[in-house]
């Protein structure tokens, strides 16, 4: 957590979009990396540790800032976006972009829940995890068949304290040093495992469609990361709904980490 996630969480709390991925072949422990064996103690995964970090910071700064946190949980299954917290999978969710109010890329129709504690977030995560698509393959008895994104928007507003009001209202021509409102989107993404057709045993039917969709979206993600690292002018975010959704949290001044899980 200290090496791959802490910097991203601190950035999100200061107004920088961020994304953390768990990537690897199916059965390598990506979901365990994210959630861990327990929500307390040393067995915590990245998400419980991140939530501890976030809400401890919110509490520590409660005299200076008002925080508004909203959580969503979505899966991308065969290139279909599905709400894991209100699982009416017949409902169409659409990726939109708001340039007028500065929301950036968002999912129209996706549920969003105001959260004020780690326990509230974990309860929603449990609900979403139960609705996530899993299936047995030759490589994993509980293989995730979708990419799942835990999404947390963090808005921070300065309290109207006397000191802040004085800074905002100075008439001496000095730069305004009052705290500003910040907004950031944090994505923690459990990617479905990459698979080979022969080793997974999914040569036909729905499992094959899932595998093909998983591998295509992972390929699109790899292409975007490669283009960003090479500073190319065109980044192919629109090649997959996965990369389109994460567009604001991959490019620009966003912070991104990739945790790669491998079998020993």
Features from the language model and the residues they span:
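Microtubule-binding structural modules
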Residues: 1-264
């Amino acid at each position: 957590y200290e090496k791959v996630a802490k910097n991203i969480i601190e950035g999100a709390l200061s107004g920088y979009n961020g994304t953390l991925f768990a990537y690897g072949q199916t059965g390598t422990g990506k979901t365990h990396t994210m959630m861990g064996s327990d929500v307390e103690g040393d067995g915590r995964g990245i998400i419980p540790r991140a939530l501890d970090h976030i809400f401890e910071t919110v509490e520590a700064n409660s005299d200076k800032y008002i925080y508004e946190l909203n959580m969503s949980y979505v899966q991308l299954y065969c290139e279909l976006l599905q709400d894991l917290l209100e699982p009416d999978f017949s409902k169409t969710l659409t990726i939109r972009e708001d340039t007028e109010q500065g929301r950036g890329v968002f999912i129209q129709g996706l549920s969003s829940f105001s959260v004020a504690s780690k326990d509230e977030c974990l309860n929603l995560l449990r609900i979403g995890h139960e609705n996530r698509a899993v299936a047995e393959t030759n490589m994993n008895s509980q293989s995730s068949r979708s990419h799942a994104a835990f999404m947390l928007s963090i808005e921070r507003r300065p309290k109207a304290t006397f000191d802040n009001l004085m800074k905002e209202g100075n008439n001496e021509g000095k730069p305004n040093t009052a705290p500003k409102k910040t907004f950031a989107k944090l994505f923690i993404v459990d990617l479905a495992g990459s698979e080979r057709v022969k080793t997974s045993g999914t040569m036909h039917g729905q499992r094959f469609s899932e595998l093909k969709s998983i591998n295509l979206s992972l390929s699109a993600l790899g292409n975007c990361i490669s283009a960003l690292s090479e500073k190319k002018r065109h980044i192919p975010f629109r090649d997959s709904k996965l990369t389109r959704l994460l567009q604001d949290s991959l490019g620009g001044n966003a912070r991104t980490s990739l945790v790669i899980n491998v079998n020993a």
